[in-house]
Amino acid sequence: SFGLCRLRRGFCAHGRCRFPSIPIGRCSRFVQCCRRVW
């Protein structure tokens, strides 16, 4: 789902998504797919 994450303009972050980003999915079991709010 890494490619899908990129397609949705997201990036992979280990652990949790830090502000100012929000979770939009998963890259893997321990890696969140995040997207910047602005």
UniProtKB/Swiss-Prot annotation:
Belongs to the beta-defensin family. GO terms for cellular component: extracellular region. It comes from Aptenodytes patagonicus. Secreted into the stomach cavity. It comes from the Eukaryota. It is found in: Secreted. Monomer. Disulfide bonds join 5-33, 12-27, 17-34. Has antifungal activity and antibacterial activity against Gram-positive and Gram-negative bacteria. Involved in the process of food preservation in the stomach during the incubation fast. May also be present during infection. Its main location: secreted. InterPro entries: Defensin_beta-like. This is Spheniscin-1. Keywords: Antibiotic, Antimicrobial, Defensin, Disulfide bond, Fungicide, Secreted. GO terms for biological process: defense response to bacterium; defense response to fungus; killing of cells of another organism.
